[in-house]
Amino acid sequence: FADLQKRGLRKEAMVQLRPFADSLADQALAQRWAFVSWLCSEVLAERVVTQPLVPMPLRSAVVVPTLFEQRDADPGDPRATIWLVGRFTAEVYEAAGPGAPDPPGNLLREQLANSPDDVAVRQCLARHLLGILEDDAHHLSESRYLGDVDLNERRLIEIRELLPDSDDPLRTAAEREGQLLYAWQEFCASAETDFNSWCAHHNVEPPAGNAYYYEN
């Protein structure tokens, strides 16, 4: 499959993949976990996009179900949870059902309860929460805040508890989001209408312009 993909023969690769996925789906958890852990740790490594290497049906029939099963089978091992949240986020939301509040965060909090001192889990949850803060703030340069201020204040507190080291880069980035969050609250209580101008008047570093991807 990988060789055919590399040669650009996607259709032929998919023909090879289906029987492999079908046979692997029938294997015991131990065999499937050996394959999935190798796939996530070695093949995907630092890749951001997983779809080309983990397409359907391998994704839905083998990889994601195995990660959920392994998570239940060995609650003390955080790898399955971290890979689910980091690599298969859409499937985490789908499994939780429509309207479920923050399924990735809840999975990580459950994992943290089983392994409270695991640095990787703490950082993964902090990174997830930071992503929410950043996403909710990415239109501040247009004087718009997309998130729930009170909820994001609680998320900021949670990040601080997860990362007590104030020099941690994730903590530093979170404190910057916190500064913007508090500035936004003060701005909303003022009579001004332009957040960037308000920041300039109050010696607050203004938010970066984040709407560039809407251009063109």
Regions found by a protein language model. Name each.
Residues A2, A25-Q51, A73-Y93, D118-L140, ...:
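Amphipathic alpha-helical repeat scaffolds of TPR domains
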Residues Q5-K6, T89, A96, A113:
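Hydrophobic/aromatic side-chain positions at a characteristic register within alpha-helices
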Residues Q5-P19, Q51-P65, G97-G105, D148-R154:
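Helix-turn-helix repeat elements of alpha-solenoid scaffolds
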Residues F20, F68-R71, E110-Q111, I159-L162:
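Canonical positions in the second alpha-helix
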Residues V36-L44, R59, L151-R155:
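Extended HEAT/HEAT-like alpha-solenoid repeat tracts in very large eukaryotic scaffold/adaptor proteins
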Residues G105-D118:
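Short secondary-structure subsegments characteristic of cysteine-rich extracellular domains
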Residues H128-G131, D135-N216:
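Long, ordered, amphipathic alpha-helical scaffolds
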